[in-house]
Every structure is written in C-alpha cells, then in structure tokens.
Amino acid sequence: MLSSLRRLVNTKYLTPVRLSSLSQTPQKSENDVKLYILEYHYVKDATEKRQPYREEHLKLASKLAKANKIILAGATEQPPTGGVLIWRNTSVEEITEFVRKDPYVQNGVVTKWTIKPFLAVVGAKEFSNDLLKV
C-alpha cells in the first residue's frame, strides 16, 4: 500500500515526501487507525498564489466534510505556510485521491504533503468512537 502511495506522489509540483509508516507503531495495525492527518506545505506568498484556486479547493474539502470524512481543516499560521486536514472514516488511498484532485496541489500551491496516522486517545465525547482504547 505505501509503495503504491509513494508512486502517486511523483508529480511535477511536489517534492519527495516522507511517508509515516504504519509499521512504526507495531502495537497497532492499520485497522486500528481511525484518524489521519493530511499536512500541506505551501509555497512562499501562498495567500496570493492560492486565491485563483481557493473556491474549488474549499468546495472539494467541504464535500468530504459533509460526508463526515474531513472533521477539521484549515491553514497553519498567518500568513499561511501550510494546511492541516484531519480525516476520519477513510483510508490512505481515499486521502491520496483527494490530494491528486486538489487544485492547490495541481497548481503548485502545495510543495509537499504527508499523510500520517493520528492515534488519538483523548478527545471530546463527539469523537469517542475515533479514539484508541488504551
């Protein structure tokens, strides 16, 4: 699975990405992963460069939020240097498909991205089904 994901990363705008391996957490299997973090790194002056693609990017993310796949998403820092999207009820393949379709990625606003399993153990009661039992 991760080797196929690495092949998908090779686009003209993206630098090589270090993928977090699920095998780095041997006590947990992929089936235990309930949340993922998609992290984007943006080009310099991203505020201006993302503007022509922002509406379509937000539309794509909003569709997945309505489907309960993305639970939080937004830029990091001000002015933005990247973005974070927290996913649930999904797979690495589905997140990768989102990345491939994202106008920010297609148009060079994103310079690097990573998908990491998020092994949450504490959270609000609305997320109790997403937490790992320890």
State each model region's role.
Residues L2, Y13-V134:
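Conserved, structured core segments of small domains
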